[in-house]
Amino acid sequence: GSSGGRGFTGQTEGKAETMNLKQAKELVRGRLSDKRYEHTLNVRKMAVKLAKRYGVDEDKAALAALLHDSAKEISKDEMRAIMRAHPELAEGGEERPTPVWHGICAAILARTEWGVEDEAVLSAIACHTAGKPGMSRLDKIVYLADMSSKERDWPGVNKLRKLELKDLDLAMLAALRQTNDFVLSQGKPLDPMSKAAYDEIKAEVDARAAKAG
């Protein structure tokens, strides 16, 4: 069968047409549990709020947010099959910790089955779990919106919600530190991309502070 492509059928001459926000919403509604669907709508709301604040395209933020967890509820085997079918899009995902797989797979499905061609949107979907070096503002917004959406209640989330409206990079450092500490505390492997993202943003923030000081 097809690798998790149920839901959206915008096929025209074998090539899916570009998915709009309404279609994306319907697609994830059919692919996710109620709880995760509610999380997705909360992430969309937060991503649009941050996009507004930082002058980023709100529709791109909304689309990336709607699709970010679209592959979260398929099996590891199905994720592996999707990455193997599209090695050129899989970003070496199979070698990386499994929590990042669903983002990579969502981006692959969005590109290959759902007609999403916008590289910025696909990037934000793919890197929303661990981050990566060279993150765009849209990448950062979706990463942060996922961590700070309305239903999240981890210790420190309110601080992050305030910080992300003031300074995107300081918020990213706090968020990456939080995630990386959590992963390590569970004895799980840290995604190398996550460490690279943290080191790069930290260097930029330090350079900015040195300039200002």
Regions found by a protein language model. Give the residues of each.
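Short, Lys/Arg-enriched N-terminal segments with co-localized hydrophobic residues
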Residues: 1-18
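Conserved N-terminal diphosphate/IPP-binding helix and adjacent helical/loop segment
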Residues: 21
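Divalent metal-dependent catalytic cores for phosphoryl transfer on phosphate-bearing substrates
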Residues: 25-30, 48-176, 208
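Generic secondary-structure signature for well-ordered alpha-helical cores
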Residues: 33, 52, 130, 181-188
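N-terminal glycine-rich anion-binding loops that anchor highly charged ligand groups
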Residues: 39
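Charged phosphate-binding loop/patch that engages nucleotide di/tri-phosphates or the phosphate backbone
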Residues: 182-213
